[in-house]
């Protein structure tokens, strides 16, 4: 089973191949952490990476509280870096079977 660092590295490579520019990794605040901050064209994308193997889908570990913390941390990042414009939260699932990218929650 891969560890979270390996999963995040694979997710970064995957996103770069899709044309994303990685801006930051493991951004932390008192609200929470964002695994990857990237740019997709004009949009800032905050990426949560989940990995695992077995019967439980890694995405099942994302609950409403986690989503709210991600949104709050993302908003803080935008303010701290004086960024305006569209932003969203995406999820990347990394399993032994492959990588899935879910473009997700729009922040505005």
Swiss-Prot record:
Cross-referenced InterPro entries: Restrct_endonuc-II-like, tRNA_endonuc-like_dom_sf, UPF0102_YraN-like
A GO molecular function held by the record: nucleic acid binding
Pfam families given in the database record: UPF0102 (PF02021)
Highest taxon above the source species: Bacteria
Stated family: Belongs to the UPF0102 family.
Matching HAMAP family: UPF0102
Protein name, per record: UPF0102 protein TM_0253
